[in-house]
Amino acid sequence: MIKKNRGMFLEKVINQSIDFYNLNDLALFEKKATPKVSKTSGVIIHKKSTVDYIGIYQGIFIAFEAKSFSGKNFSLSNIKNHQHEYLEKINKHKGLGFYFFFHEDEEKFYLMESKKLNNLTKKSISIEQIKKNALQIELSFPGIVDFLPWVKSLINN
């Protein structure tokens, strides 16, 4: 996969999945717009963006950050402190905050609760640690990753 387009496949799959959920009234999700600095007008955005996606399912607020990576490790520098803190605040207030990973080499999707990253002392997390601490979910026809069963299981615990 070309580095320039890293994350585009994951974003497309997630967008198709949430469109399916929204269309079938199973849940309500949206991709948050990423603020950009205008080169022509010189407008500067002062507030940092929080996470990629927000939504609601069965009365529970949900927020997640989508990350693609390749190789044996995911560098935690790809997660900004304010993003992780935001997800943890969501969890503190009885919502659900998590990470949606795509490992490009294996072409596999993983969902991991944000709290699983809390006490890491290294600057990266190995694919083996992700496999141990996350749930792998499959891509199904027509390009949908059905993550609602995982969300439901976390809500019901």
From Swiss-Prot:
Site (Transition state stabilizer): K67
Example of a GO cellular component annotation carried by this entry: cytoplasm
Enzyme class label: hydrolase
Protein keywords: Cytoplasm, DNA damage, DNA recombination, DNA repair, Endonuclease, Hydrolase, Magnesium, Metal-binding, Nuclease
EC nos: 3.1.21.10
Subcellular localization, as worded in the UniProt entry: Cytoplasm
Chief location bin: cytoplasm
Catalyzed chemical reaction(s): Endonucleolytic cleavage at a junction such as a reciprocal single-stranded crossover between two homologous DNA duplexes (Holliday junction)
GO BP field: chromosome segregation; DNA recombination; DNA repair
Gene Ontology molecular-function annotations: endonuclease activity; magnesium ion binding; nucleic acid binding
Highest taxon of the lineage: Bacteria
Cofactor note: Binds 1 Mg(2+) ion per subunit.
Binding site for Mg(2+): T50, D52, E65, Q83
Required co-factors: Mg(2+)
InterPro entries named among the record's database cross-references: Resolv_RecU, Restrct_endonuc-II-like, tRNA_endonuc-like_dom_sf
NCBIfam families: PRK02234.1-2 (NF002581)
Record's function text: Endonuclease that resolves Holliday junction intermediates in genetic recombination. Cleaves mobile four-strand junctions by introducing symmetrical nicks in paired strands. Promotes annealing of linear ssDNA with homologous dsDNA. Required for DNA repair, homologous recombination and chromosome segregation.
Entry similarity comment: Belongs to the RecU family.
Official protein name in the record: Holliday junction resolvase RecU
Species per Swiss-Prot/TrEMBL record: Mycoplasmopsis pulmonis (strain UAB CTIP) (Mycoplasma pulmonis)
Taxonomic lineage from the root: Bacteria, Bacillati, Mycoplasmatota, Mycoplasmoidales, Metamycoplasmataceae
Gene: recU
